[in-house]
A protein has these predicted regions:
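Conserved Ser/Thr-centered positions that define the repeating blades of beta-propeller domains
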Residues: 244-245, 290-291, 343-344, 390-391, ...
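Short glycine/acidic-enriched loop and turn motifs that connect beta-strands
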Residues: 231-236, 280-284, 330-335, 379-383, ...
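Short loop/turn motifs that cap or connect beta-strands within the blades
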Residues: 200-210, 253-260, 300-307, 353-359, ...
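Repeated scaffold domains used in trafficking and secretory/extracellular systems
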Residues: 211-217, 260-269, 308-319, 358-369, ...
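Blade-level signature of beta-propeller repeat domains, shared across WD40, Kelch, NHL, RCC1
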Residues: 510-512, 520-522, 527-538, 542-545, ...
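Entry beta-strands of beta-propeller and related beta-repeat scaffolds
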Residues: 220-228, 272-276, 319-327, 371-376, ...
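Hydrophobic single-pass membrane-targeting/anchoring helices
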Residues: 142-187, 422, 519, 618
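Beta-strand-rich domains and repeat architectures in extracellular enzymes and scaffolds
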Residues: 204-239, 264-265
Length: 907
């Protein structure tokens, strides 16, 4: 759908596991040190357990010393009206008349006033319910008769909400809901429990860290040097800002506040005004950040009411004497593209400027000298490039008469000399091998002023231009892993400034020359099949190029790790996910010790779900065998300890013209196992994929799916009394339709009516479980432009549903759902965006819910904490054991959370 949050006080970043090197040696020719090779599995039918791990001692309580800012990296914030204060509702009397035919109904907007007599317990009131099943993927007994309350009265509140860009993220806003008030003092009781660090528990033996970091651009002013990019190390991506206050002698991770996209593409600035822009170019998300010093950055969350629209994309930015300009394109509802431009005085408040009449369909590059701005775009008719000009800081634009029919416009085509503008066609050489250079003193009239010659025969031409204090520099790629930089002070005479050679597997994208004359280059390098690490090079004015030592930058290195699902059976818990680029399996029996298992093999691997059935355990996921191909990953175990990989063949194999096929959902019932995933063709068109196996040996792919499964994403599935039910959604995020499929045999599926709360314009289901013989699901809906989490319950295996909103007084997200005999438990977070704490919701009927604030140990504090996976298991006659996995993360720290608690129902 998934945030920067504070680590637990006193938690120091753990030592990197021995044998791992997050970064290479800082030399001019990067040293390739021996790395522990990826483990080869000689016995493919056996997986090796890492052995018992000792439980870490709880950290002592000490005052927090972290001074950074805290934001979620991949969420957008939508402000909505704050709820009005309401009078507290008095508690009902403990005793009621036996003559009352119906129990009362009361509204709940916040936790009841006063303190509980047991402050270590979190108590939720509600009606007594019959005993039921104890897992999201397990079917419970037939339902008992349910006594209905009197007339239901519902009220709602609007509060700030959050929409995450992580997969399957549910967002809830505040809402008043009704709850039961029975004749007995009954209800669910959820203990506050204990949270502890999971950093040392959820690891796997691996040769790399699974990191995915890139540098995309650089800028410098005076002694400040800034490098920007992205850190999409799953599952907590963040925008990347590196800062040097002393001309590149030392580097540190910048400070970032606010909520934004995790990818920064461009940066400009100096003299107290800096601007960065970003976005991934495919999802439609944009990001803008401002800074006064290049170190502390703030995301622009409200750029202006009419400045940006859906379909806008920023290609380039420039600093002017009066502020900043941005250029790009916009895509209309009909799919047509048009030029777009914006200006701002301070980088925080933006206005859209008129671009009609410029006869270009997009603007790719822009530079400014004072308030004279020059841009280059693609003509509305034909190919090539057309130059545009503004004389007033980007408020008004005119098309010049200068065009280059043979050159495509690209970012980096334009540069600045002290007295004139410079244009160099990128990746374009003449028949003689030279590159033409054009100059203009005003940006209106252009003429050729020189050529760049002597390029390598392997070079396609100039990759980009950069401007610096004394002139311009042209970047050329001489071959794979080889770059040359040429400089000029007049546009006609060019001299080689530096070579960056022997950068095997590296790509350089960002360049800058500081006022002191040091040339910097930034990019990334494939360090292994699961690692993509930063590259930052520095070449002094008089000296050799050398690699900047980034391994010592505090908070920069991260190890990819994620726990995606958790389930239990007969006293054993099994968690699945990924760590260091490999699929991860972790298990514990009777709380002796957690054991970790690694699958080995090439490619980036992950597991998304796990279930237990009559034939044993089955975990499903995906393997990225290369950047273009993804295959299903299935592993099975009879005892939860020894796991073996299932051969992907037959119906499990990809079609030849479909490079992408994954499995991310599994459930088990009396008939067998149902798996769900996604298939994509070469054009990127996706379809749902479903399989059934009765014995974990023969897998049958369903050929009969409603509408062929086109555009459908199945998020969860569960066994029902007469087969299986799968839930999910189809369509875009703001126009999603919920999906409910039913199958008698796990192979042939039919669609049932969509589930949508009243007034919702968009709705999708994310989790489903079986409880007391009925289906209970959690979903997300769009109402009046705001997202809310809702629950749905069905007594007839998904044929019809009743819905209710989940209570939340602030922004909230619900990630997982589990069922016990005592009731239902859902987990996620609640609070201010970027400052939320872990939260749990409980219910005894699937429709009336109570939110529990979890404030102890690692579950709350500075920053963002959340629980993402939950499982329940029968502990004893007094109640059920609740185990949840989660995360606590900041911009420069990231920790896993293990929470244990218990759930009981008083009668």
């Amino acid at each position: 759908m998934p945030p920067f949050a504070a680590p637990v006080p006193d938690d120091e970043p753990p030592e990197p596991p021995k044998g791992r090197r997050p970064y290479s040696s800082p030399t001019a020719e990067p040293e390739v040190e021996p790395r522990r090779p990826r483990r080869v599995v000689n016995r493919p039918d056996k997986l090796v357990a890492g052995g018992p791990l000792s439980e870490p001692e709880p950290a002592e309580e000490e005052p927090e010393t972290y001074q950074g800012t805290r934001i979620p990296p991949y969420v957008r914030v939508y402000p909505v009206e704050e709820p009005p204060e309401t009078e507290p509702v008095p508690e009902p009397p403990e005793e009621q008349s036996e003559d009352d035919d119906e129990p009362g109904v009361r509204r709940v907007g916040r936790p009841p006033a006063g303190r509980p007599t047991r402050p270590d317990l979190l108590v939720a009131t509600g009606p007594p319910r019959p005993q039921g099943s104890s897992g999201r993927h397990h079917r419970g007994p037939a339902p008992a008769a349910m006594r209905r309350a009197g007339p239901v009265r519902r009220g709602s509140r609007a509060t700030p909400i959050v929409l995450s860009v992580a997969a399957a993220v549910l967002v809830a806003t505040g809402v008043l809901v009704w709850q039961w008030s029975g004749e007995e003092a009954s209800g669910l009781r959820l203990e506050a429990g204990m949270g502890r660090s999971g950093d040392e528990l959820f690891t796997v033996p691996a040769a790399g860290d699974g990191v995915n970091q890139k540098l995309n651009d650089m800028a410098s002013a005076d002694r400040a040097v800034v490098a920007v990019g992205s850190d999409t190390t799953s599952p907590t991506p963040r925008p990347l800002f590196l800062f040097s206050p002393d001309g590149g002698k030392t580097w540190q991770l910048g400070q970032v506040s606010g909520v934004s996209t995790p990818t920064v593409q461009r940066v400009v600035g100096g003299d107290g005004r800096w601007l960065a822009s970003g976005g991934d170019g495919s999802s439609g998300e944009r990001g803008l950040w401002t800074s006064t010093d290049g170190f502390s950055w703030s995301a622009v969350e409200r750029p202006g009411p009419d400045a940006f629209r859906a379909g806008d994309h920023i290609h380039d930015i420039a600093r002017t004497a009066s502020g900043f300009v941005a250029v790009g394109h916009t895509t209309g509802e009909d799919g047509g593209s048009g030029a777009a431009a914006w200006r701002s005085d301070d980088g925080a408040r933006w206005e859209r400027v008129e671009t009609r009449g410029l006869e270009v369909r997009e603007i790719r590059a822009v530079v400014a000298k004072g308030d004279t701005v020059v841009a280059i775009g693609q003509p509305a008719v034909g190919e090539g490039s057309r130059v545009l000009r503004s004389a007033d800081g980007g408020r008004h634009w005119q098309a010049t008469g200068f065009q280059l029919p043979e050159a495509l416009p690209r970012t980096g085509t334009l540069g600045l000399l002290p007295k004139q503008f410079v244009l160099v066609p990128t990746r374009q050489r003449t028949v003689t091998g030279d590159v033409r250079v054009y100059c203009s003193p005003t940006g209106a009239e252009w003429k050729q002023c020189g050529t760049i010659g002597g390029l390598s025969g392997e070079s396609p031409g100039v990759e980009s231009l950069i401007s610096h204090k004394s002139g311009v520099a042209a970047i050329t790629q001489a071959g794979l892993g080889k770059y040359s930089v040429l400089t000029s002070t007049n546009g006609s005479d060019w001299n080689k400034r530096a070579d960056f050679a022997d950068l095997s597997g590296a790509t350089l994208r960002g360049f800058t020359i500081s006022d002191a004359g040091t040339l910097f280059a930034g990019g990334d390098q494939a360090a292994s099949d699961v690692d993509n690490q930063l590259v930052l090079m520095a070449a002094p004015a008089r000296g050799e190029a050398a690699r900047v030592k980034l391994g010592e930058v505090e908070g920069l290195a991260r190890i990819a790790r994620e726990t995606t699902a958790l389930t239990s059976f007969s006293g054993r818990y099994v968690a699945v996910g990924a760590a260091s680029g490999d699929a991860g399996l972790w298990t514990i029996k009777n709380w002796q010790s957690w054991k970790s298992m690694s699958l080995g093999g090439p490619g980036r691997q992950s597991l998304g779900d796990v279930a237990h059935g009559e034939r044993g355990w089955l975990a499903v996921g995906a393997t990225e065998t290369n950047v273009a191909v993804t295959d299903p990953l299935l592993v099975t175990s009879a005892d939860g300890e020894s796991w073996k990989r299932i051969e992907v063949s037959g119906d499990l194999a990809r079609e030849r013209d479909h490079p992408y096929l994954t499995t991310h959902v599994v459930t088990a019932g009396e008939q067998g196992y149902v798996l769900a995933g996604e298939s994509k063709d070469q054009a990127g068109v996706s379809r749902a994929a479903v399989w059934f196996t009765p014995d974990l040996r023969k897998f049958t792919r369903s050929e009969k799916l409603p509408h062929g499964g086109s555009g459908v994403h199945i998020h969860d599935a569960v066994a029902s009394s007469d087969g299986f039910v799968a839930v999910g959604g189809s369509g875009a995020a703001d126009q999603e339709n919920s999906v409910v499929w039913h199958s008698d045999d796990g192979v042939n599926w039919t669609a049932r009516d969509p589930v949508s709360p009243p007034g919702a314009t968009s709705a999708g289901l994310r989790r489903v479980t079986s409880y007391q013989g009925k289906m209970v699901a959690i979903g997300t809906a769009l109402v009046d432009g705001a997202r809310r989490a809702f629950a749905a319950a069905s007594d007839d295996d998904g044929a019809t549903w009743r819905t209710a909103w989940l209570p939340a007084e602030q922004a909230a997200a619900v990630y997982d759902l589990a069922a016990a005999d005592e009731g239902l438990v859902a987990v996620g977070w609640h609070g201010a965006p970027g400052e939320g704490d872990s939260a749990a919701w409980t219910s005894q009927d699937g429709l009336s819910w109570n939110r529990m604030a979890l404030t102890k140990d690692r579950l709350a504090g500075r920053g963002m904490q959340w629980l993402s996976a939950v499982a329940v298991s029968r502990a004893d006659d007094s109640g059920a054991e609740v185990v949840a996995l989660g995360r606590s993360t900041t911009y420069n720290a990231d920790h896993l959370i293990l929470w244990t608690s218990s759930l009981s129902a008083s009668r």
